[in-house]
Amino acid sequence: MNYKLNKSAAIISQTTNDYDHTVGYHDISPFNKNNDNILTMHRFPLKNTDLSNNIKAEICLWHSRESIIEKIDETDSWSWEQGSRLQWLNCEEIIYNIKKNKKNKSCIYNINNKQKKILESPIYSLSQKNKKFLYINYSRIRHFWKNYGYEFTDKIEFERQPANDGVYLSDFDNNQKLVLSIEKAIDICGLKKSNQYFFIAHPTFSPKGDKFVSLLRFINESGILISYFICTDLNKDTHTLLAREKVSHFEWVDNDTIVVWCRNLSPKYEKIRFNKYLEKYFVSSIKKILKLLKPGIQQKLISTHYHMIKLDNPYKLIKLNENNLTEDGHPQVSKNGRFLITDTYANKIGYQKLLLYDLIKNKTHFVGEFKVDSYLKNKNLKYDLHPRWNHNSNKISIDSSHDGSRQSYIIDIQELINTIS
């Protein structure tokens, strides 16, 4: 069996298997706010495993009830993990990244009148509240972290700690400004003495759009990704370091609360990661031993869990239900704020779990598990479920390869929610 579902959940729609179809990352809902039947979608040649942008991603609308996938454009600004950052701007318009004249830009497309508007900057995170968006240097991301950036044709020499690169804020009239430079982020994190090549990833607006969080990252001498989690208040022009060293996926619960998978250790441990000899001989040996243990035991030993961070007391990390949420995943909070949906990475036999966490009752419920197809595993390519809510908080969109190719699915969990509420 290549998948299993909770008896109170049901797959109600899936994309056609004549192409690969994928939504993208876990932080964007593909559902139209006024019509659950219309979802944003990327389309690729069937069983594509080429991570280069030589193959264009088709920008599509999935009319799920009618099983119709409508192509509206194509782009070569896409990544394996996140697509083109395709998302709804409002109920009539979508926005996605494109490349024009060798520069990364974004395009607004009106689904009613078919008109396009080209913006001078690419998009990462959108705030519908204040009609602004954040973006980053996708070429720098691609250079240091291949699965998340976009190909670039010109040879670029990157600085280690640039003052003129980082997170940018833009409106839809092309007014742009740098709101967090890589140099500033390095200073915030106390890393000015480091000689690493840094980059900033995942800048994400708070629900009200007055704050954003981002990850300052670098890859150390052992090939380990090191991360620092920063919150920027745009109104106050302040920055707060929230977590360090091991920080993975996160989600805003409300405008002042964040859930994040991270390690909660003292800064003393951080110094080990900057000592190349201790890192090479001590930490690497410990990691080999940990890999032999079950995920839950691993997390207890290395203090890595889902934590809640409240911005009014950011230095007190509140651990979530560790007995059931013992693995890193891709969380998204329901629109009504009651539930968190997340996944896990594939286990040793290739299955990824889909889990529903009740934020009020502090309890986790099994939704399903799905097997990564062998053609991806054989090429050492992961394909995450990246679960995403609809706007009524009763359906989930996932990407999965359990049927033999990359496809998207809609799972109705209303009955499951009714039984646990």
Kindly label every feature range from the protein language model:
Residues 20-27, 45, 51-104, 374:
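Blade-loop segments of beta-propeller domains
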Residues 291-306, 318-363:
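Loop/turn-rich, solvent-exposed surfaces of beta-rich toroidal or solenoidal domains
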Residues 28-38, 78-101, 124-132, 136-137, ...:
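Blade-terminus and WD-like Trp-Asp/Gly-His loop motifs, strongest in beta-propeller folds
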Residues 12-21, 72-80, 176-196, 318-324, ...:
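Surface-exposed loop and turn segments in beta-propeller and other repeat-based domains
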Residues 243-249, 318-332, 363-388:
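Conserved blade-ending motifs and adjacent loop-strand segments that build the rim/top face
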Residues 75-87, 91-166, 179-195:
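Asp-box/WD-like beta-propeller blade repeats and closely related beta-sheet repeat scaffolds
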Residues 41-55, 136-164, 214-225, 263-301, ...:
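Short, conserved, GDST-rich strand-edge loop motifs in beta-rich repeat architectures
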Residues 383-421:
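Blade-level signature of beta-propeller repeat domains, shared across WD40, Kelch, NHL, RCC1
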